[in-house]
Amino acid sequence: MATLLRSKLSNVATSVSNKSQAKMSGMFARMGFQAATDEEAVGFAHCDDLDFEHRQGLQMDILKAEGEPCGDEGAEAPVEGDIHYQRGSGAPLPPSGSKDQVGGGGEFGGHDKPKITAWEAGWNVTNAIQGMFVLGLPYAILHGGYLGLFLIIFAAVVCCYTGKILIACLYEENEDGEVVRVRDSYVAIANACCAPRFPTLGGRVVNVAQIIELVMTCILYVVVSGNLMYNSFPGLPVSQKSWSIIATAVLLPCAFLKNLKAVSKFSLLCTLAHFVINILVIAYCLSRARDWAWEKVKFYIDVKKFPISIGIIVFSYTSQIFLPSLEGNMQQPSEFHCMMNWTHIAACVLKGLFALVAYLTWADETKEVITDNLPGSIRAVVNIFLVAKALLSYPLPFFAAVEVLEKSLFQEGSRAFFPACYSGDGRLKSWGLTLRCALVVFTLLMAIYVPHFALLMGLTGSLTGAGLCFLLPSLFHLRLLWRKLLWHQVFFDVAIFVIGGICSVSGFVHSLEGLIEAYRTNAED
């Protein structure tokens, strides 16, 4: 009897030891300690299988314990971390069917939020990358020539690729090998990359970049409104700064916005109006096709001003900020890649044609905003439509910037820097309204003192556009999915990071130099 008892105890101990070793080996294998030989790789695969069986057995034991009323009532409940495979941050992954649960939280809203089709998602991306900032692309061709045209194509390819890899960073494989969505935003991806040492550093960096880009976008809308109105009515005794003040007075009610329902009704009309404007400009350019100056398109570049063109082109493609939210709200997320391909192909073709045709028409006389080159009668009509579009587009980035600021700095809790902007009944507090008004006034002051559309666009594209579209997505992709990437994917990510970094620094420096030079010229005048 004693021999039988010792034999059973020995078998149990051996089984427990083997399972523990298998579990630890499986965890080490998944953490990145790759095998050096084929035999070791097979061994790790067996360890993974044993690890899976071990966890499945634990889960079955728990289910049996819950279903048996006469079991050990005093037994201690298992810790959740023991029955869920933990990776990276230490938090258990959601179950395989929890994609909607992850997508339904965070910035996506609740489950009752209606999903959008691939066509609607493509329309949103088109609105972002086919906006009125294409008006500065002919100015980029002025300083870049044929290389500027190549960059329009290259930027489309790279931004499409980085958008896809950014979405790939939202997903991971669970213990069953199923790909599930474990993150819901750009900030969540950044925090995951900086965990565990600095779990919030990445999110703060992304938030700062988002705020800068959104606020600069608002400033550009005010700048272009003042510029267009001033050039539309040069006979009126109203300066560009005065037109900017008038535009800001119209925009001041944006401070009272609680949601974008009222503004969203005009988005389709604004987009259609913009396409009509582009068609009018291209039609006028085609009417002067016999005078096109093909010899003016250069194969060489202006070394000092070409980096500004890079920033302008990159800024016209920025859409990465809202791609995680957009993909999370799609009815068929599997169609995201196809949607990105077609939207960026269309944007590349339309931008390239618009920039080339406009530059061929006016050559060296091309201005920062191409509509300023149109004859007076046509320019006034087109510019009024563009000003209306700019004013109606302003609330979108403004509201997004306010939301980022409120979530980052003005939330109730111990981590918040300031108290919440809203009272308990959901009403906006007076000082919160004051801060919103101050943000509108800040965009006005920047537009007054730096009224240079193309230079500001190049500065923003070099500073935050390249960071959010090139640098961070490639860096996050390498950090989170390193073990699963093929060699050519690693090469693409590293190349994009290096090239993007060089273009970002050079573009920022030269845009800043251009602004300083323009400011000195205005001061002398």
From Swiss-Prot:
Tell me the impact of changing V263M: In DEE114; uncertain significance
Q: What compartments host this protein?
A: Cytoplasmic vesicle membrane; Presynapse
Swiss-Prot/TrEMBL GO biological process terms: beta-alanine transport; gamma-aminobutyric acid import; gamma-aminobutyric acid transport; glycine transport; hippocampus development; monoatomic ion transport; neurotransmitter loading into synaptic vesicle; neurotransmitter secretion
- Describe the reaction catalysed, as an equation: 4-aminobutanoate(out) + n H(+)(in) = 4-aminobutanoate(in) + n H(+)(out); glycine(out) + n H(+)(in) = glycine(in) + n H(+)(out); beta-alanine(out) + n H(+)(in) = beta-alanine(in) + n H(+)(out)
Entry's transmembrane regions:
133-153, 205-225, 266-286, 306-326, 342-362, 384-404, 439-459, 462-482, 490-510
Q: Which residues carry this modification: 3'-nitrotyrosine?
A: Y186
Q: Name one GO molecular function term.
A: glycine:proton antiporter activity
Q: How does it sit in the membrane?
A: Multi-pass membrane protein
The record, for InterPro entries, names: AA_transpt_TM
Q: Does the keyword Membrane apply?
A: yes
Identify the tissues in which this protein is expressed: Retina. Expressed throughout the horizontal cells or more specifically at the terminals.
Q: What is the effect of changing L445F?
A: In GEFSP12; uncertain significance
Task: Keywords in alphabetical order, please.
Answer: Cell projection, Cytoplasmic vesicle, Disease variant, Epilepsy, Intellectual disability, Membrane, Neurotransmitter transport, Nitration, Synapse, Transmembrane, Transmembrane helix, Transport
Q: Could you tell me which Pfam families the record lists for this protein?
A: Aa_trans (PF01490)
Segments carrying the region annotation (Disordered) are: 83-107
For this record, an example GO cellular component is:
synaptic vesicle membrane
Q: Which residues lie on this side of the membrane: Lumenal, vesicle?
A: 154-204, 287-305, 363-383, 460-461, 511-525
> Is rRNA-binding given among the entry's keywords?
no
UniProt main location, coarse: membrane
Organism superkingdom: Eukaryota
Cytoplasmic compartment segments: 1-132, 226-265, 327-341, 405-438, 483-489
Which family, according to the similarity comment?
Answer: Belongs to the amino acid/polyamine transporter 2 family.
- PANTHER family, A to Z: AMINO ACID TRANSPORTER (PTHR22950), VESICULAR INHIBITORY AMINO ACID TRANSPORTER (PTHR22950:SF689)
- Quote the function comment for this protein: Antiporter that exchanges vesicular protons for cytosolic 4-aminobutanoate or to a lesser extend glycine, thus allowing their secretion from nerve terminals. The transport is equally dependent on the chemical and electrical components of the proton gradient. May also transport beta-alanine. Acidification of GABAergic synaptic vesicles is a prerequisite for 4-aminobutanoate uptake.
Quote the disease note of the record. Answer: Generalized epilepsy with febrile seizures plus 12: An autosomal dominant neurologic disorder with variable expressivity and incomplete penetrance. Affected individuals have variable types of seizures, most often febrile seizures, sometimes combined with non-febrile focal or generalized seizures. Rarely, afebrile tonic-clonic seizures have been observed. Developmental and epileptic encephalopathy 114: A form of epileptic encephalopathy, a heterogeneous group of early-onset epilepsies characterized by refractory seizures, neurodevelopmental impairment, and poor prognosis. Development is normal prior to seizure onset, after which cognitive and motor delays become apparent. DEE114 is an autosomal dominant form characterized by moderate-to-severe intellectual disability, onset of epilepsy within the first 18 months of life, and a choreiform, dystonic or dyskinetic movement disorder.
Record-given protein name: Vesicular inhibitory amino acid transporter
* Organism field: Homo sapiens
